[in-house]
Amino acid sequence: MANNNLWTDSYWLLLMQACKKKPDDVKSPWSKTMVDLAIELHIHPKTLFEKMEQLLDHKTASLQKIWDTYADNPRRLNKDAKRVREMKGFGDADSFFMGVESIDSFETFYLPVADDTKLTPASLTILIDLYFMLTPNTMVEETPEVADVARMLTLTTKEVVEVLAIFQTFDPILKRKALPTSALVEAARKVWDEYANDTQNMNDKKERALAYYHK
């Protein structure tokens, strides 16, 4: 869990901004809105979720003032939130990562596995779940489930099929020839090793990933 000492009161404006995104409500801690802000601030989504609940309750005088000032004034909110983001040192990863490993693992779940791809451990988690739902002869671009997942992850059907083909090389039943080593192959191997014999873990992580990619 994130250290609360990374939190500053100026971040209330960024939370208010996230809160006012449609629909106006407490976002799931794993929604794209919350995760992207958590990565930006280097604060765990669950911590931000707790803060957002406090903001919505606005039971303290300071939070009530923020609510009165910005809740119905989106122009001022966006202007002042932009100023917060422009502050010197905002989102400074170097100062954040010193001695903090647990948040690194949360962030990397949503970050690309290589510079030349937008695939992430989160999207690979959804794709390995798809893999176990299909048979090899249905792991093709024409399969509706392939198209649906591609659309959700903003990938091409070709990219989805390529990842499914990588997973096939790890499947001991299929005995496919190994592919040349690459960052994507290694990331897919890591996902396979984590989930292939741990369905509960895969389902838990899949739900988290789906919350992020849900439109």
List where the protein language model places each region:
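Intrinsically disordered, charged low-complexity linkers and terminal tails
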Residues: 1-215
